[in-house]
Amino acid sequence: MLQTTILWTHAVAGAIWIGACACFAIAGLALGAGSPEQRNFVAKSASKIDALGLVAAAVLLATGLTGLTVVTALHGFAFSTAFMTVLAIKIGLFVVMLVAMTWSMRVGAAVRAAIAREHTGAAAAAMPQMVKAHVAVVAMGAVALILGTWLMGS
């Protein structure tokens, strides 16, 4: 029962992180460059969406480590090379996803500061890079979720 709860919490946290990043990317693409809506999105909503993604990433890390500890105890440290390879890929993806997300969050903070100083073009200049970072997180997260289904079966 514990292992199932950990696994589902892990999967839901991953889905929330990917979903939050997908929402950010969709909103970023839908809003007109330099529009008041885009500035308002960056100034008021983007950090909240990113905070949700970051909390989900923290839960993902915690449940991943807990799940690995449980599985390790059950298998006595005896994992196949394929399992270890897939696990290493998932860990690598997580690290790169976290780097992309935190970079975008730093850019967002700088843009919010620029908007507060009445620099109206800041959001339009930064949004394409922020959207690309979130799309990258979505793509890598989708791969990680697919790899996770493989790990469940092994």
PLM regions and their residue ranges:
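Polytopic transmembrane helical bundles with strong interfacial aromatic enrichment
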Residues: M1-S154
